[in-house]
Curated annotation (Swiss-Prot):
This is Peptide chain release factor 1. GO terms for molecular function: translation release factor activity, codon specific. It comes from Pseudomonas paraeruginosa (strain DSM 24068 / PA7) (Pseudomonas aeruginosa (strain PA7)). SUPFAM superfamilies: Release factor. Methylated by PrmC. Methylation increases the termination efficiency of RF1.
């Protein structure tokens, strides 16, 4: 393991001892805000320190076994050789585990997300594919035990959506979906194509982490224009009786959000405001993410919405992720919700990139 990483672990060990003392301090215990903060930090640090202690113990065992290699007793030397080999193997495994524990954590990984899918080039076929993508992500969410709530939808003339916006709620949603942002291209023969020609169309996907309520971005009410209108979504006859749908325009940025899925105007407004906060937060972080991508060339995590990230070729049953040159011939399974077949290799590639940069 790199000396710089061992130094980090030594510093973390000192912090662990400090946290242990703080959590036993009467003054801290009486201050619930500080106590909760230290408890969260302790819970994050403890597994790393326990693993580091195991690493140090195995390291000591290895040194002891290596010393026995010089013993005059041949049987003892043979036994020591076995112990050295075993200790080296365990040390390598523990070192690898510790490195992964030290990887910088994305503070948004545990967040819920707003999922935006928009039809791009390709007209009706692009709208139909938007619907297919939304169904794919909904099936994937179901497999993960997540909840999908549609906020806004603009249906295509021949099926699918020109645009569909949803909130996805559950455990580690952003961690799993954050690399789905970008342009998704489809190649297939449309049902209306009589000559059997393959058409190419595209959709864009944006995955925005929902800001934490306590760290939510401040929005000046004077910067907003709020319009209400009659919903055209679900809800039976009620939707035509009241102006329950809400459209909010953020004047400084020009960002427009709308929500029409709830019968209550108040609920629609609250959801639209949460979505607006996510979009403004995303806008603020875009420059920083571009800087990181340019310095470390994190192609997997660039998040560029215009970047073509994936192609779905229906005649060949093929799905290709262009960022990591991954090609799978299980398109049917992926479209039915087995998106983990693409997501897991992406996460592994990103983690490998982080490991390569760790300790630099």
């Amino acid at each position: 393991m790199k000396a710089s990483l061992l130094k980090k672990l030594d510093v973390l060990s000192d912090r662990y001892e400090e946290l242990t003392a703080l959590l036993g301090d009467a003054e801290v215990i009486s201050d619930q805000t500080r106590f909760r903060a230290y408890s969260r930090e302790y819970a994050e640090v403890e597994p790393v320190i326990l693993a580091f202690r195991d690493y140090r113990k195995v390291q000591a065992d290895l040194e002891g076994a290596q010393a026995l290699l010089k013993d005059s007793d041949p049987e003892l030397r043979d036994l020591a050789e076995e112990e050295v080999a075993e200790a080296r193997e365990r040390l390598a495994a523990l070192g690898d585990s510790l490195q992964r524990m030290l990887l910088p954590k994305d503070p948004n990984d545990g967040r819920n997300v707003f999922l935006e899918i928009r039809a791009g080039t390709g007209g009706d076929e692009a709208a139909i594919f938007s619907g297919d993508l939304f169904r794919m992500y909904s099936r994937y969410a179901e497999r993960q035990g997540w909840r999908v709530e549609t906020l806004s939808e603009n249906e295509g003339e021949h099926g699918g959506y020109k645009e569909v916006i949803a909130r996805v709620e559950g455990e580690n949603v952003y961690a799993k979906l954050k690399f789905e942002s970008g342009a998704h291209r489809v190649q297939r023969v449309p049902e209306t194509e009589s000559q059997g020609r393959i058409h190419t169309s595209a959709c864009t996907v944006a995955v925005l982490p929902e800001p934490d309520e306590q760290a939510a971005i401040e929005i000046n009410p004077a910067d907003l224009r709020v319009d209400t209108y009659r919903s055209s979504g679900a809800g039976g006859q009620h939707v035509n009786k009241t102006d329950s749908a809400v459209r909010i325009t953020h004047l400084p940025s020009g960002i427009v959000v709308e929500c029409q899925e709830e019968r209550s105007q108040h609920k629609n407004r609250a959801k639209a405001m949460a979505w607006l906060a996510a979009k403004l937060n995303d806008q603020q972080q875009a420059a920083a993410q571009q800087a990181i991508a340019s310095t470390r060339k994190l192609l997997v995590g660039s998040g560029d919405r215009s970047e073509r990230i994936r192609t779905y070729n229906f005649p060949q049953g093929r799905v290709t992720d262009h960022r990591i040159n991954l090609t799978l011939y299980s398109l049917g399974e992926v479209m039915e919700g087995a998106v983990e077949q693409v997501i897991e290799p992406l996460l592994q590639e990103y983690q490998a990139d982080q490991l390569a940069a760790l300790g630099d």
